[in-house]
């Protein structure tokens, strides 16, 4: 018989946004007893496991699955500082549970891809010259490696998944984080995208996470430096310098709106990129942000591009159901979920975000 896994109890509790004391109160266990269950000092009897399962809405088998939890990678330290301990625990739990789903689905589903998401050490990578490469060089090299034409990336989610990644829609329960990423041995690179985030912002954030996966899984630096590098590489990848220079003939909201429609990234991203390329002055940048604040565009801009939809995880689920004959009950058992939660997570999903239109 499998053993109770204390890591799964912590994972289940945090995924429901419960503190240890709140779960103890809901189950009528003493917090000391619950603490011993979570640390592995005490194995709960079957009736206690059933009581815990009822409160956190997971089948009892959830607690007997093997595995461990992973925390945030080092380059997400700044994101951690934004969140309360409870909100942070919920996000980490969501990521871990979704990762374990990918692992279990992968047992019967062969993922074929001759492409990959590279890892680049800036200290070793030389590119085509003897000089140390810039982030512009890395962005150019990545676009060439993936054989992208000039102009905007047509569909970033599709591009990442075509090159070996898996994008997983998640409900983080907070709008402070749009996306996260993980590179773990034996799995594709995973990107967790917060449902409800604006489409234009998701594209930049997803490119930012891609940059972390390219630059920072083998080389760790100061947190602020890693964030700055990821942001700059994302901008260079989505908005190639030569094309931005040729298009940005004037700097105002009308021109930025036109460029947004073409590049499918936010006006804010274009403005930051223009400042990085020294195409605008600090004063122009300051006035731009003042105007964006007055119009209420800093949180959500008008004229969002169409929301991109990931497909790989959906295909994995459909393969099990259509090719292997799994019912909803079977899928729930495979993933250690209730049937209701399986349907919530993996039924055909609505668009990840709604769209706003500019009213003249």
Report each predicted region and the residues it spans.
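Active-site hotspot residues in diverse enzymes, especially metal/ion-binding acidic/histidine motifs
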Residues: 1-360
